Regions:
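RNA-interacting cores
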Residues: 2-174
Length: 174
């Protein structure tokens, strides 16, 4: 899939990965076990400020954006009130990148407030390894996967979802 969109005055004719580094000010302490929910609430509530993005948010489909965790990592198990952290959001959708860039810098929830957004396009290069500090999240009506699925079934589901995402993204079938 190739796009030709303007983003900060740059015209590209290739698939771009847009990265937004959002500086966040914490309005209250957030225990590590609540962090992903707080971050998801921050991003989701920003999406829901726009009528057309509400249906995008509520649709059961691939969103083609990812959200990291706060940086710097806290050695303790609590992210501290009155501290500034960085949240990284990435997407391949230029319109979504522009929206996040404009909205997240002034957005706030009860737990955090966006201050600034730094934008960049990730340089193209061969990927030699993939690592993450954010786990894979698999939503299911049955709840947490370990209560109803073996490790082999979980790995098969992850692979199947990856193939579906690739097919959806490229328009090809593998």
């Amino acid at each position: 899939i190739y796009v030709e969109k303007y983003w900060e005055g740059i015209v590209e004719q290739k698939l771009n990965v847009y990265e937004m580094r959002v500086k966040l000010y914490l309005l209250q302490d957030i225990p590590f076990k609540e962090l992903q929910n707080a971050v998801a609430n921050f991003v989701d509530s920003a999406l829901c400020q726009n009528e057309s993005l509400i249906s995008f948010h509520e649709t059961n489909s691939y969103k083609f954006y990812s959200v990291g965790t706060l940086w710097p990592l806290e050695r303790g198990m609590t992210y501290k009130k009155d501290q500034i952290y960085t949240l990284t959001v990435r997407t391949v959708e230029p319109i979504l990148a522009r929206y996040f860039s404009e909205v997240l810098k002034n957005h706030y929830t009860q737990k955090m407030k966006g201050l600034t957004v730094e934008n960049r396009i990730i340089p193209h290069k061969m990927i030699s390894e993939i690592y993450t500090l954010s786990p894979v999240i698999m939503k299911s009506d049955e709840g947490y996967w370990r209560s109803y699925m073996s490790l082999d079934e979980y790995e098969e589901r992850l692979f199947s979802n990856l193939v579906k995402k690739y097919n959806s993204f490229t328009g090809e079938q593998i």
